Amino acid sequence: MADMDRRRISILGSTGSIGVNTLDVVAQLGGRDAFDIVAITGNSNVTLLAEQARTFGARLAVTADDKQYATLKDALAGTGIEVAAGRAALVEAGQRPSDWVMAAIVGTAGLAPTVAAAERGADIALANKECLVSAGELFVKAVADGGGKLIPVDSEHSAIFQSLEDDQRHAVERIVLTASGGPFRTWSREQMANVTADVARAHPNWSMGLKISIGSASMFNKALEMIEAKHLFNVRPDQIEVIVHPQSIIHSMVGYTDGSVLAQLGCPDMRTAIGYALSYPDRPKLDVERLDFAKLARLDFEAPDETRFPALRLARTAMDRGGVQGAVMNAAEETAFNAFLEKRISFLQMADIAEDVMEDMVGYGSAITMDDVFAADAEARRRAAEAIAQKEMAA
């Protein structure tokens, strides 16, 4: 197939869980015969990054880790594949002309390259939460001004996107995000007090990366998704509900003013949402497990406990306050998450750190430009680091 007939795509974060699944979908839908892989990026796993670049014929391979540049360069020697490293190179990957970009870099590091892709008019398949949580209205405007489409990849937001009737947006009454409840759904706070990262990362239904898995256990993942939903679907905070659904079969729902509720169901497999985003508005034929209703037997639901999982309450606080509070909450939680991995604070203290920093930064600045967002992010990380150090001293 000639280059002009292939769809040009880039994958920001190709070595993570979403990136690996995206390339699986690309392979199912024709691989390098159907797709021109303009750029792929990874963090420190340059062995996998080089393998992906070779397999799919990527034009550019970028590692975020400057120290891995030589290793990646050697691994791709003689292939003709361009190699680059560092934060600026990630932004360059987002700027390279392509039709569709998978935004799957975890954390605030994914914000600048995704904005760069949006500003030049690419369709954005959004898996990075921070673009909307931290930059919200600014990011949505960047996509709109660029002229591309914004297609959510999170299973919950993909479900809502698929359940929204375009000509009935005015009739949307509520958005219902489902949550598995994670591995600690039935645990008391006392039981959760001393859990380790290895225990927290064991999600009952989904296969995900470390950050998202532990975020699911603490329900910070769901808290971020609440803020995302507000910006993605232009709804009020009071229209966003969370319901715990342990089986993860109903991925989310939309309630309308006539009492109807539309939902998207499927087996827990990220490739379904990825395939939908890649093929939108069409639906691809994918080799994924089909839902067997006879074997389901039951679907359970329960209200979330915001005492045991305060992240949900913090999300509502951030939405009500507006400004840079989303960026502050996210930055403080990311900093606390890293401290938890390093065994410097406990599982429950992650939410404490986020809440303390949010309270400390009430009224801090405004989100008028991306620089405002980055400044708030940096300040929140600084204050979170101080709070973590204080908890260590008190321990």
Annotate each PLM feature.
Residues M1-A395:
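Catalytic, metal-anchored helix/loop core of enzyme active sites in primary metabolism
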